[in-house]
Each structure stands twice: as C-alpha cells, then as structure tokens.
C-alpha cells in the first residue's frame, strides 16, 4: 500500500506521470521514508543495508516492463542523499522512470541528492526518464542534485550532472530529461 498525502500525490503525478499506483514494479519515497514498494517476477527492489537507497535488479531477458522510483519531499528543511543502483540483465528492454519533486512551503531549504549507478549487461536496452519538479510558496529553496557514477564497463552511461534549483516562489517549475542507455556488448 502506498502512503502519500494529497500534496505528495500531486508531485508524483508531475515527476512520474502517475495518477494511480502502477501495476508493475515501483518504489515510492516520501520525506526520507519508504512510502510504498512493489516488485514483480522480473524486477526486484531491495533497500540498501549500508546506506540510504535501493538496489534494482532486472532479470535477464525482461522485456516491455517498467520500474517507477519517484521521490517526493514536502517537509521544509529535509536534506537527503540517496544511492540507487540499477542492475539490468542481458537482453532486457525496459523503462526506468525516476524523478524528484519538492513542495517547500517553509523557510528552510529542502534538498534531494540522487546518486545513480547503472550496471547494464550485453544487448540490454534501457529507456531512462527523469523529471524534477519544484513548488510551494515558502522562502526555502528546492534543491535537486542528480548524479550518475560509472557502472560496469559494458555500459555507456551519460553523466547526470545537472543541478535543478527550482526556487521560484509560489510558481511551480519543472525540468526533465530522457536517456536511451544501450550496452556496448
């Protein structure tokens, strides 16, 4: 069961284009806590034991499946760094939808740093979608720092070194980017 309030549901709709809980694999994070998770026969999601974040493992041969891992912050002053590793097996063709939204109505800055690593096996294809959204009428900043670290040598992984400072007062702001990741094998 997914535990989100109305503000968080609105943010999820912005960053993941979800208006209801998806049928496939997902991991929803809200204000630094797990808000809901579902795995499938082919996609497993586990909480990291040594630091904040998750491991997403996609079995070889998985086709036409997706995993959604949106993050929402609606508490002013919350700052977090999350480490997510994606292990994509051989001959996969999958979609990963990530992103973070911050609704900051307070005076303190709110920040989410998402560090992603992609381990993509031979002949695998990944469509990766990530959006950032900021809203709220508080004076606190909405800071999102997505970063990609290198994965296995099979994968060409473009770096996500953008910083999204979505600090526009009460006016919402949205940034997004899309990547098609292919193994080099």
Question: Locations of the language-model features?
Answer:
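Residues that form generic nucleotide/phosphate-binding pockets
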Residues: 14-15, 57
